[in-house]
Amino acid sequence: MKRFLVFISLHLFLFLLVIAYQAQADEEWTIDRFRDLSYARVSGEVTHGDSLNFFISTEDNCNQVYNNFTFYTYEKPGDIKQLLDKHIPIKMNGVELTAKVISVSPFLMGYRVSFSLGKFPIKEYIYFLNEFYEEFQKYEIEIIDGIDFKAAKYFDIRTNNWKLDKLIPSVLEANKLCKTIEHSDS
């Protein structure tokens, strides 16, 4: 019996150690290019597959950042595609806004829904967003109910948050990458 308890205790300790390590994991940004744009992307903390994206296009002379995010959902209502091009109510750190649904696509056992927050001048936007993040010590988006819209019908997990400690250097690096695309492809 004593061996069994030691065995269970050791496994429980290892399990908790792995969980603690995952909870302390650093934010990891992906900075890359695709065709005529570069991007900086960070994964969500609640649902790792949800991403917060900052796209920079050569079409805008690498001066604008297009900010969007994705939510994955297992919910499969028959009318999920009707969300396309709709403005869905969200809360960003408790502030009520809307985000435009730009795509709904089958993914794994559910759907990936992409939302647009808009296009903004790069430096002004990322410094504003960084101040917003530092003020609240978080960057959280919650999909909420609205007029004729029940969030739970479409999204099983309605909240995610992202670490933005490396926002400024990551987006500025993507901006530099965009400028190399412009020069090398022109």
Please tell me what each predicted stretch does.
Residues 1-25:
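Classical Sec-dependent N-terminal signal peptides that target proteins to the secretory pathway
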Residues 23-186:
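A generic "folded-domain core" signal
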